[in-house]
Amino acid sequence: MHIDNILNDSIFDSNKEMKYSYRLIRENFFDGQAYGIEVERQDFSNNKLIYVERNEIRKISNTKGKVEGLLNLLSDNKVSPIHLVDVLGSYVDEYVSDFKEAL
């Protein structure tokens, strides 16, 4: 798995900082590429890492631009890893047909 792009953001809540990373991931798939997304949240308190949460959806589409659009959607709305599938589920169901078109 390769990382093609990373979008980072932070949210401050009382004495805790939550750092979000949204990664566009790429992997070889049959004779082409498949793109997915990994989301990670790191919680810091007093500059000490206290919690990490991560989730990913691999092989969303073989069309990089579509997956980049989803990456921006997640970053713009500061979606946490736990809600990744809830937010992207219908997009993933639609975009998976891109692989059939490529065959």
Ranges and model annotations:
Residues 1-23, 28:
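Negatively charged, low-complexity tracts enriched in Asp/Glu with abundant Ser/Thr
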Residues 7, 30, 63-66:
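A generic structural micro-environment signature
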Residues 20-22, 35, 91:
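Aromatic side chains
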Residues 31-55:
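A short, structured beta-strand/loop element
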Residues 44-48, 61-65, 82-85:
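Glycine-rich loops and low-complexity Gly/Arg-rich segments
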Residues 50-64, 69-74:
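A short, exposed loop/beta-hairpin motif centered on an aromatic-Gly-Thr core
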Residues 66-103:
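Compositionally biased, intrinsically disordered linkers/stalks adjacent to structured regions
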